[in-house]
Amino acid sequence: MTISLSNIKKRDHSKISDGTSGESSLVKRKQLESATGDQEEEYTDHEIIIEPLHFANNNNTVLTDSENYLRWQNTISNVVKSVVSIHFSQVAPFDCDSALVSEATGFVVDAKLGIILTNRHVVGPGPFVGYVVFDNHEECDVIPIYRDPVHDFGFLKFDPKNIKYSKIKALTLKPSLAKVGSEIRVVGNDAGEKLSILAGFISRIDRNAPEYGELTYNDFNTEYIQAAASASGGSSGSPVVNIDGYAVALQAGGSTEASTDFFLPLDRILRALICIQTNKPITRGTIQVQWLLKPYDECRRLGLTSERESEARAKFPENIGLLVAETVLREGPGYDKIKEGDTLISINGETISSFMQVDKIQDENVGKEIQLVIQRGGVECTVTCTVGDLHAITPHRYVEVCGATFHELSYQMARFYALPVRGVFLSSASGSFNFDSKERVGWIVDSIDNKETPDLDTFIEIMKTIPDRKRVTVRYHHLTDQHSPLVTSIYIDRHWCNEFRVYTRNDTTGIWDYKNVADPLPADALKPRSAKIIPIPVNNEKVAKLSSSLCTVATMAAVPLDSLSADILKTSGLIIDAEKGYVLVSRRVVPHDCLDTFVTIADSLVVPATVEFLHPTHNFAIVKYDPELVKAPLITPKLSTTRMKRGDKLQFIGFTQNDRIVTSETTVTDISSVSIPSNLIPRYRATNLEAISIDCNVSTRCNSGILTDNDGTVRGLWLPFLGERLENKEKVYLMGLDIMDCREVIDILKNGGKPRVSIVDAGFGSISVLQARIRGVPEEWIMRMEHESNNRLQFITVSRVSYTEDKIHLETGDVILSVNGKLVTEMNDLNGVVSSADGILPSAMLDFKVVRDGNIVDLKIKTVEVQETDRFVIFAGSILQKPHHAVLQAMVDVPKGVYCTFRGESSPALQYGISATNFITHVNEIETPDLDTFLKVVKTIPDNSYCKMRLMTFDNVPFAISLKTNYHYFPTAELKRDNITHKWIEKEFTGNSQSEK
């Protein structure tokens, strides 16, 4: 199975283990073949069966190489007409399977009904959307009609009437023809290619099911067939055919360390197919016991008597082992009756030699009692168990609330960890339930809001009673560690993630129908609370009091706006106005205002805050909380009015990762311009600033803090700066920022104004005097620099220019001499114009004198106010917006279209080829230069239909795609910030109608 996402395991590339100790040899299949003989006869007599693809009589004559080649060629040419390439999306995370887009293989097993056989890990246990492509490149939608609860097979259905240009042929299933030494071909979509034909020979037919690892789907309680065919991702679901064109097995998985492949036998698959064809329920029984095939020598060590061994060897002379209980689930039908290590002798009087016999008996006796004879430590026991319904312990619904998804713990997961099949399983640890950013799956929710959650229905009822924005206690644990229960508090988000839905599987339509459970309860009224503030433990009293000016700022982003991850972020903040509630904080934590912001005082009380200001280049933001809610002795600190210099002696006060305050004396070692590396996908980063470096070992352990004088005057901030993303990890740089870079904005806010910043939209760097001479800077300007510069001898140069439509603008390589007649000696001389204004800040014209290509040039450069994102559209699982500032900074020529800043893991956008950084310029040949036009066009596109899109890559390469809409799982919506209330309002579109949330 070829996966488009790098963090998803490929089924055929997973490391496997046999599940047995020692070498297993062949198990005689004579009884199995006779057991399926009646089923095959029933299948042959069924009126809808297509004639099998049979091309030669098996008369045991020896074929020459050329005859063998021609015969295989004839067979394959017919088989490929039944094989389809499956393009699918598993829409939602479910049972440890991530949401994904992928490709696999299937083959037609009933041409009249339009039934395709493939793997269960392709169909998936959760919502599925897909289509198939036939050999002649005809395309047809498919829906899932069955996925086995345990074994790795499932069925998809298509409408044969939609296939107009080819005659559909079905492959006949012949499980009895899978024999050791048989030459086979695996015909499928190997490694994402439309058609690959891989050759091999069957080497084993009695292998235990392979194990693919923890927290993923694993088959069990069945034999597997082994061969060496070197299949890889994408071949999942391929037919394994013999030279006569019969399907003898189903490709399922493979080893990463060898060319070994694993095929699922067709015996139980054939039985399920017949049930579907005859419109009968596919009953599946279980006593919740996992069996493994163990060789006789190991069975003897576990207590098998010589008499029973002799009987088994005589009855099954080719067998070398019996089934032994590996796992018995607590509270299951077999619990306290069967023990691990018990050897299975018979069921209902039938001597057992294979998994398929066990499956057959259990499937035929759901709800009935069966009698098992086992041997335990040399003693024979007879136990009676009531067969349970396997479908009843397989989740068929899930709940979506607070941005996370939940369902009942499945038999699949419970079996692997030997747990009772009960509990609320968190299949997507996100939103309010983002317990651990490193581990998204495998959590069990034991209680919430101090109420036990033994099952999904109880969980739903509890969640109905919890108001929006409330903080509640959750008890939970991970499947891999039953001995470590965990307790945390979470913030209930029912305003950004307002959906509270229950999705239920519908095997008739193939869609998971949903119903809305409950509307959000309004948030509880906030009450003022008190907090005691403990001074910083230092001898300097003025510095110690600064604990009354420090707090913690945390944010929860609603969506990955501006290509910034929607993570929960936290850092320290400086209270710059205790009376009005203003807090200065790193923009790493407050990248935009489409989020919830919280201020924590003294690690004692939390109050909500709003985003008041975002600096476009200097990496700081200002948020505001309601001071009436805080009854604590907070102090507005004294802020410095002079810039720091190299050699200044300071006090460093930092916050560790555990929010502990640490202090240290330090010295300013360097003040220089920095260039933070840009990310592959453009997003906010600090530019055009001079960073402070200090001589302090403690600072490397702190993610934030402040720099002060001995009298408590705040001289600077110690901030995290977001850099590039490498190997799915965010690179964060720690540097100091002079408080003088923030003073103008702070003063305007304190005086009741609204600060606005207008900047010269270009990137600047520094060069040495030597480089300036080489670039043609005249000697008189060099002498002037040497005379007037008090800090560092350098010239400022243009390193990049943002996109602009102005004819007169700076160019890369320009050396800046002066601005408005003032010599430019450092980056601070190029700071933007800061003022208080209502509406759009008018542009200012600045007189630049630069050296360009060795000549002095005078330029009038217009400043611009950076517009933060205040609107975006969600379409086909992608987030579309006007190109944000980071995009304009990175591009010279910006296409006229809506910009894709993000695409979902399982979305149509990903499946059909829209990437982050793409511009959608046309939809159905209509130009879409802005969001209004785009919305107008896409609202006319019906559900489940194709539209043509023309796009432009980040490198201005045009291309076109077709995209199929799916409004059931991926509706179109618009989120827009109200200019008066500054609240974000969501509108969801259904056809030409819309609903506001």
From Swiss-Prot:
Gene3D superfamilies found in the cross-reference section: 2.30.42.10, 2.40.10.120
SMART domains per the UniProt record, alphabetical: PDZ
Annotated spans, Serine protease: 83-273
GO biological process, one term: stress-induced homeostatically regulated protein degradation pathway
Effect the entry attributes to changing residue 235 to C: Impairs BIR1 degradation and death-promoting activity
Matches recorded under InterPro entries: PDZ, PDZ-like_dom, PDZ_sf, Peptidase_S1_PA, Peptidase_S1C
One term of GO molecular function: serine-type endopeptidase activity
Primary location class: nucleus
CDD domains assigned to the protein according to its UniProt record, in alphabetical order: cpPDZ1_ScNma111-like, cpPDZ3_ScNma111-like, PDZ2-4_Nma111p-like
Domain PDZ: 300-378, 779-854
Annotated Pfam families: PDZ, PDZ_1, Trypsin_2
Protein localization: Nucleus
Active site positions: 121, 152, 235
Keywords linked to the UniProt accession: Apoptosis, Hydrolase, Nucleus, Protease, Repeat, Serine protease
EC number: 3.4.21.-
Region (Disordered): 1-43
Oligomer status and interactors: Interacts with BIR1.
Note: Present with 3150 molecules/cell in log phase SD medium.
Family, per entry: Belongs to the peptidase S1C family.
Role description: Nuclear serine protease which mediates apoptosis through proteolysis of the apoptotic inhibitor BIR1.
PANTHER family cross-referenced by the UniProt entry: PRO-APOPTOTIC SERINE PROTEASE NMA111
Protein name: Pro-apoptotic serine protease NMA111
Origin species: Saccharomyces cerevisiae (strain ATCC 204508 / S288c)
